[in-house]
């Protein structure tokens, strides 16, 4: 069954989904070529916790429909930028969080919007005071601090609103911060290297890991076979 171009949106995580850790998260030509081919017919968005400056270096040549960066807080689409948080985040909340991190002597980096705390995924008790001002999200052993009410799923829903998209969402992911992405998906796909908790809630687990798992799904959609295996409607 051929699926119409306005009927589906594929939303994919980046690290350990589109790009592998073994390749230092640099997108492979095979994956980027397939995504670019797919994006000419269907909507394909990359939904990642990463900042633009890193994506620009890692994903050279990748041309999705849109980028949803910093865990859903920043959308780049049609040469426009959409920030998904209130002014109070910059004027008050983020400043207070930085003060707390400095007092705890925790190392962090500041993105355009969110804060990154590497290696603190298992030490959330130390960061509990931060939850008065923002939301902590763990991804494997790292933690990201976001404005309240923002996550990958919120970013995807905002993109739907911006484009007037009414079709089905197919989400691909591998780890904890993809729970929010799966929450808004009609079909949830875990790549073969995903953590067990993500595989358990997925509708499909790919045979191949990382980007080859994404290619596997895109090929099925392009060939018309995806609709035969999964009830997209």
Curated annotation (Swiss-Prot):
Q: Give yes or no: UniProt keyword Phosphoprotein.
A: no
Keyword set for this entry?
Carbohydrate metabolism, Hydrolase, Magnesium, Metal-binding
EC number of the protein: 3.1.3.18
Q: Which residues bind Mg(2+)?
A: 13, 15, 174, 178
> Which amino acid positions bind substrate, per UniProt?
152
Q: What residues form the catalytic site here?
A: 13
What this protein needs as a cofactor is: Mg(2+)
Gene3D superfamilies to which the protein is assigned, alphabetical: 3.90.1070.10, HAD superfamily/HAD-like
Select a single GO molecular function from the record's annotations and give it.
Answer: magnesium ion binding
Q: What are the record's GO terms for cellular component?
A: cytosol
**Keyword Coiled coil assigned:** no
Q: Which reaction does it catalyse?
A: 2-phosphoglycolate + H2O = glycolate + phosphate
Entry-linked InterPro entries: HAD-like_sf (IPR036412), HAD-SF_hydro_IIB (IPR006379), HAD_sf (IPR023214), PGPase (IPR006382)
**One Pfam family this sequence matches:** Hydrolase_3
Concerning PANTHER family, the annotation shows: HAD SUPERFAMILY HYDROLASE-LIKE, TYPE 3 (PTHR10000:SF8), PHOSPHOSERINE PHOSPHATASE (PTHR10000)
Q: Which family does it belong to?
A: Belongs to the archaeal SPP-like hydrolase family.
What is the stated purpose of this protein?
Catalyzes the dephosphorylation of 2-phosphoglycolate.
Recorded protein name is Phosphoglycolate phosphatase 2
């Amino acid at each position: 069954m051929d699926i119409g171009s306005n009927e589906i949106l594929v939303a994919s995580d980046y690290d350990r989904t589109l790009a592998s850790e073994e390749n230092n998260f640099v997108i492979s030509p095979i994956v980027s070529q397939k995504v670019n081919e797919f994006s000419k017919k269907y909507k394909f968005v990359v939904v990642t916790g990463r900042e633009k400056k890193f994506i620009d270096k890692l994903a050279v040549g990748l041309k999705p429909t849109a980028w949803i960066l910093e865990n859903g807080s920043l959308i780049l689409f049609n040469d426009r930028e959409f920030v998904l948080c209130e002014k109070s985040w910059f004027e008050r909340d983020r400043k207070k969080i930085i003060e707390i991190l400095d007092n705890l002597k925790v190392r962090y980096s500041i993105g355009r919007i969110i804060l990154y705390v590497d290696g603190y995924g298992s030490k959330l008790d130390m960061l509990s005071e931060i939850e008065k001002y923002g939301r902590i999200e763990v991804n494997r052993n790292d933690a990201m601090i976001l404005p309240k009410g923002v996550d990958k799923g919120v970013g995807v829903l905002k993109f739907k609103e911006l484009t007037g998209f009414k079709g089905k969402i197919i989400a691909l992911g591998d780890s904890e911060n993809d729970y929010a992405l799966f929450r808004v998906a009609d079909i949830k796909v875990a790549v073969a290297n995903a953590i067990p908790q993500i595989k358990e809630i997925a509708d499909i687990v790919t045979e191949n890991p990382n980007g080859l798992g994404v290619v596997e799904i895109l090929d099925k959609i392009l060939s018309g076979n995806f609709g035969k295996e999964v009830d997209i409607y």
